[in-house]
Amino acid sequence: MEENTITKIEAQKKKKDRVNVYIDNEYSFSCNTELIYIHGLKKGKVVDLDYLQDIIEEDNYLYAKSRALSFIEKTFKTEKEIRVKLREKEFNEKIIERVIEFLRKYDFVDDSRYAELYIKERINKQGKVKIKYGLIKKGINDSIIDEKLSKYSANNENYIEAMREVALKKFNNIAKRETDKLKIKRKLSSYLLGRGYSWSEIGEVLKEIFSENN
């Protein structure tokens, strides 16, 4: 029998969409059934090992793409999150990049859109500092974050009003247990810092709250 001849192709028992391929009576590799038909692989066919390696690479890509699509099925993800997930599955960087390009092409991943939705979901509860930090951890580019946050500047009434509500609610809660204004101010400042508001934003809202509650 000639060298590098396919001697058997058998369906896997547990994964019906995959087959095992034997070369010269020895197991060689497994792949998606679709690739068998695409490349015309069949028993008795003589194959080049480099060509088989290309098929294996293509199979790895299809599997990686399938894993990525499953990962983003229920919730929107960033490119970084998808890359991390695929690296955990030990796919190589070339395949990961191909998957990311596919996801971008069909709008399955869009970091700009992700940042926009992330901000809208949190802007009434958190400050821009915390939101930006959260997006950086998600792998969003600084330029995208700054662009999306720019609309929530210090003169954005909706942003400021949301901060006032957060601050006033906490102020009333602290004031029930504490009468010393300095201690109230310190506790409220610490709380607002933890929520991601800047010192300048905190200073303005504290000035308003304490002037209204003298």
Curated annotation (Swiss-Prot):
Subcellular location, principal:
cytoplasm
Q: Which GO terms describe its cellular component?
A: cytoplasm
The cellular location(s) given in this protein's UniProt record come to: Cytoplasm
Q: What is this protein called?
A: Regulatory protein RecX
State the superkingdom: Bacteria
- Give a Pfam family name: RecX_HTH3
Q: Which NCBIfam families match?
A: PRK00117.4-1
Q: Which family does it belong to?
A: Belongs to the RecX family.
Q: Which UniProt keywords apply?
A: Cytoplasm
What organism is the protein native to? Clostridium acetobutylicum (strain ATCC 824 / DSM 792 / JCM 1419 / IAM 19013 / LMG 5710 / NBRC 13948 / NRRL B-527 / VKM B-1787 / 2291 / W)
- Function statement: Modulates RecA activity.
In its UniProt record, which GO terms are filed under biological process? regulation of DNA repair
